[in-house]
A protein has these predicted regions:
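Bacterial Sec-dependent N-terminal signal peptides
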Residues: 1-23
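Zymogen propeptides
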Residues: 21-164
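A short catalytic or substrate-binding loop motif that flags glycine-/basic-rich loops and adjacent residues
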Residues: 47-51, 133-136, 209-210, 238-242, ...
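Short glycine-rich loop/turn motifs
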Residues: 52-56, 139, 213-215, 243-247, ...
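Short, glycine-/Ser/Thr-/acidic-enriched flexible segments
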Residues: 62-64, 99, 149, 157, ...
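Structural recognition of the beta-strand scaffold that forms the well-ordered cores
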Residues: 91-95, 142-143, 151-152, 216-218, ...
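Conserved, well-ordered active-site substructure
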Residues: 103-130, 229-287, 297-331
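Active-site-adjacent helix-turn-beta-strand microarchitecture at beta-sheet edges
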Residues: 104-237
């Protein structure tokens, strides 16, 4: 009898876990023409009892007919639609980096054709009794190599470097009384022992063809582990606030997942917390993933057509950088 009860309880919990996952519907027909290894899905199920709308695109990384790249503009911002026109109408276009309204510059790394074209911000002034102190976080990014392998890492990437330094296992957070910071502040031994540091998961030559930054990291080794405090992205309990979201991740079988979540439409689409966002990506099989700039910036175009409705009343918010998937030119 006890064994039967245990089996019934186990079945109940498994059934509930399966039912808790969101139902995604293929909506390729709404965004044609699409190549074979690229698909679009939509979800309108309630999320934890609240109205929810989201889309994700799935692309096979090894497909030579797909080109994964990025674009950025200097000291200004333009709408995703303008980026779409500027880039010869790519298959997919999505916002990515956080940015400064004062300078219009990205606050996160962008790598285009193997070159750093935007950089992380590694110094944050403290306030109150710590006015003369500074915190120095690393920034997270998702990259795709020439061999079409994806990776999520925390990076030191300022304008003094040709290549970003990747911290694969954990983020570092420094605090001192100096505004300026260098790679040797994070890894003093890097200059003399680069091979040893690589064994510790620190790579001073992160060779990515394309990368875009954001944060915080949401998934590590297939588990939800949100490094918000280490990356200093959202203050206090903001990790559980619901907002529009943009995020990216990848699976062990070589699929890139690009997701946008609609929000700030009461009773229609109320957004997601970082924890909910991480769970959605985990349920889709992602092993590593990170959050990108969200809120009014969240926007994904498929063949130039909007997926979610942007939350800004003016429509698409101008941004300084985007991630793109293009149809590769015929050889």
């Amino acid at each position: 009898m006890k064994k039967n009860i245990f089996v019934l309880l186990l079945f109940f919990f498994i059934a509930n876990a399966v039912m808790a996952q969101q139902k995604w519907v293929n909506v390729d027909t709404a965004f044609q023409p699409l190549p074979n290894n690229f698909h679009v899905f939509k979800c309108t199920d309630n999320l934890d009892g609240k109205p929810f709308i989201a889309y994700y695109a799935e692309a096979k990384l090894k497909d030579q007919q797909l080109d994964f790249t990025a674009d950025t503009v200097k000291d200004r911002r333009i709408t995703p639609l303008k980026f779409y026109e500027r880039n010869n109408q790519p298959l997919l276009l999505v916002n990515c980096t956080f940015f400064s309204y004062a300078t219009n510059r990205s606050l996160n790394v962008v790598i285009k054709e193997g070159k750093l074209v935007a950089f992380n911000t590694h110094t944050i002034p403290m306030r109150g009794k710590d006015t003369f102190q500074y915190k120095h976080p690393l920034g997270s990014a998702i990259g795709i190599s020439k061999k079409r392998r994806a990776d999520v890492a925390w990076l030191f990437a300022d304008s003094s470097l040709k290549r970003a330094i990747a911290f694969e296992r954990k983020p570092y957070l420094l605090q001192d009384s100096f505004y300026l910071v260098s790679k040797f502040d994070f890894v003093p031994e890097l200059h003399h022992f680069p091979k040893r540091e690589k064994r510790r998961g620190i790579n001073d030559n992160w060779k990515m063809k394309t990368a875009v930054g954001g944060g915080p990291v949401l998934l590590q080794n297939g588990a939800i582990k949100i490094t918000n405090n280490e990356e200093l992205k959202f203050a206090g309990k903001a990790i559980e606030d619901k907002h529009p979201r943009t995020c990216m991740g990848y699976t062990n079988d070589g699929r890139l997942i690009v997701m946008v979540i609609q929000g700030r439409f009461s009773g229609i689409a109320e957004g997601a917390t970082l924890t909910q966002e991480a769970q959605l990506l985990k349920d889709l099989g992602c092993v590593e993933a990170l959050n990108l700039d969200g809120g009014g910036s969240s926007c994904m175009l498929i063949n130039g057509k909007e997926t979610i409705k942007p939350s800004d009343k003016e429509g698409e918010r101008p941004v300084p950088a985007v991630f793109l998937i293009k149809k590769a030119p015929n050889p």
